Amino acid sequence: MADRTPLPHCKEFDLHTIFQFNMGVQNINRGVVLTGILGVLVSAYTLYVEMAAESRPGYKALCDFAEHASCSRVLTSEFSKAFGLLPKNSAFEVPNCIYGTLFYCIMIFLSTYDNIAVVRLQLLLNAASLITCVYLAYLLIFVLHDFCIVCVSTYVINACLTYLSLKKHSLLNKKQK
């Protein structure tokens, strides 16, 4: 009877482990796509509120709850375009939600690649988004003294995207070893 012990220099082919890995990465990719779509939808609503508040005096958005919980007031502040960092009439002085939409679309696109280098790029973009979230949250709390549920929603979405990218990175690292 033949010995079925694998050769010492050959790795054992474990279909279950490979299938489990692929399902994990596929589920993470689905999560990134769904979270990214949610980010695009929230950003679209943000743009709607911003444009409506600027064009119609007295406009009250659904996300305006109280005196210090008004997303329309936050979204028409000086920090709502180009993060308040660029001079007026600059080519890049667009609403922050446009940058957010671009970020979410890039994250969705990058999720189609199961490559460690691409996931590292996602992590870099996620780090930039989290730094931006901290900056905007600081402005929201300490400068504007307001609360914006739509803004906070984007912070949560960005944190979820970061978590998913970290999970994918971890899975791809395990695969390489």
Mark where each language-model region is.
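Membrane-interfacial helix-loop segments of redox and metal-homeostasis proteins
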Residues: 3-177
